[in-house]
Amino acid sequence: MTGMTPEADVVIPDTFLGLVATQRGHEVDRSLTEMDREQLPDSEVAIRVQWSSINYKDALAVSPDGKVAQMSPLVPGIDLAGEVVEDLSGNLEPGETVLVHGYGLGVSHHGGFAEYARVPLDWVVPIPSGLQARDAMMLGTAGFTAALSVLGLEEAGLAPDQGPVLVAGATGGVGCVAVELLAQRGYEVWASTGKPDAEWLLDLGAAGLLTREETSRPSTRPLERQRWAGCVDPVGGSTTGYAVRTTRYGGAVALSGLTGGTDVGLTVHPFILRGVSLLGIDSVQTPIGRRQEVWRRLATDLRPRRIEELGVREIALSHVAGALESVLAGLGSGRTIVKIGQ
């Protein structure tokens, strides 16, 4: 892809650092590279990236078998926050702090693991008052997805007095934010995880912990004992099957992920005999109006207060490749944010 004309692009240095993933046969080379500004796409908004974050999808984007990356070479990073240095449309002011996530960022369009980015205007969300760029990436796609899940459940009728709520994959990015969001809104939250050191979830507000085995066991029964008023499920697979089979009459499961697989092993019985709803949560193509609304909520009444002190790790751009390897190996937990540049 070619960049803007030199006259238009002087706001970006001739060269800058970026993590570039290049497919070579069945291998993906991941290296911190000095990039040329002409490598950036032709998009209206130039951003000096200050912060990004690590997501499971980023790890898949640099995996030979991930089936996520749609171009090579690619700067991965499905989240970014930083400062506008130029907007060719004139809608944004230089110096304005913005965030970008979803759409094709870090998948079919160079993403957040570089010191500079160019993105379409209609992907950009001005960071609401009350949040800084670092705060936005502490939440990132994971926090946004957690908020979409909680709001989706409440819009489907969930309320704290209806009973306990299950959060699956609770030590992951979506899960840990969902635990705190639900707990601070008055819900009794039970957190499920396969990680051995998960007591910090109790400090986020979880009422109790469940093992992954308890919430992902296969079953031939179409229905099980009604236990949950609702569930936030970023895992998928047999976990979704368990959640739906054990959700109470009229409850809902908000499904946003597939780390546990795509076969959920369900019959129609929970839906037609208990009125259970399975809500699809998509953070990638969320319309911009809804996106802005959710970020306003995350800056105000939905803002988590304890995630940073309990579950956030900060790394440099030079350590991103190693962090992605850890995620692929199943070693990641909590939120990892990336400080880009100075």
Task: Cite the ranges covered by each PLM segment.
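Glycine-rich NAD(P) Rossmann-fold beta1-alpha1 loop
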Residues: 143-144, 169-176, 236
